[in-house]
Swiss-Prot record:
Domain of life, per lineage: Archaea
Keyword match NADP: no
GO cellular component: aspartate carbamoyltransferase complex
Quaternary structure, from the entry: Contains catalytic and regulatory chains.
Keywords assigned by UniProt, alphabetized: Metal-binding, Pyrimidine biosynthesis, Zinc
Name of the protein this chain belongs to: Aspartate carbamoyltransferase regulatory chain
Disulfide partners: none
């Protein structure tokens, strides 16, 4: 293994890179990886990064992410990069993107919102990406970046 390699290479699975330092735990919670599932989970935290200063990396062996999971990651790590690995090689690499409309991922923090009492799927529209600000489709409550993680 090369001297500069600090985290093991995975044979198959997903690597989520450029997660802001300290947010790896929220990423694995979003993906439901806090419980043992038989796969290997590798985490590098507070790694030097030219892009972010410091970053976290999460490697999930034997698992590929759904579009919904990638969208959730984009909400807490908008500069993250997802790498798909097969036979120890990166076969696909893409940046996460926040969609214009977010459906069924977040819950509205407004206790009076119809989405918290009726059988309707929560929907949010992106008001701004930098800083991230979302607006509920039903009650028009605005959610700021710091409120998103607690409403996933």
């Amino acid at each position: 293994m090369p001297e500069n390699l600090k985290i093991e290479v995975i044979p198959e699975g997903t690597v989520i890179d450029h997660i802001p330092a300290g947010k790896w735990l929220k990423v694995i919670e979003i993906l439901g990886l806090t419980k043992p599932n038989g796969g290997t989970l590798l985490i590098a935290s507070n790694v030097p990064s030219k892009k972010l200063g410091r970053k976290d990396i999460v490697k999930v062996e034997g698992r590929y992410l759904s579009e919904e999971e990638v969208n959730k990651i984009a909400l807490i790590a908008p500069m993250a990069t997802v790498n798909i690995v097969k036979d120890y090689k990166i076969i696909e690499k893409f940046n996460v993107e926040i969609p214009d409309e977010i459906t069924g991922i977040l819950k509205c923090p407004n206790p009076n919102c119809v989405s918290n009492h009726e059988y309707v799927t929560p929907r949010f529209h992106v008001e701004s990406r930098e800083p991230l600000k979302l607006r509920c489709h039903y009650c028009e409550r605005t959610i700021n970046e710091d409120e998103i993680a607690q409403n996933l």
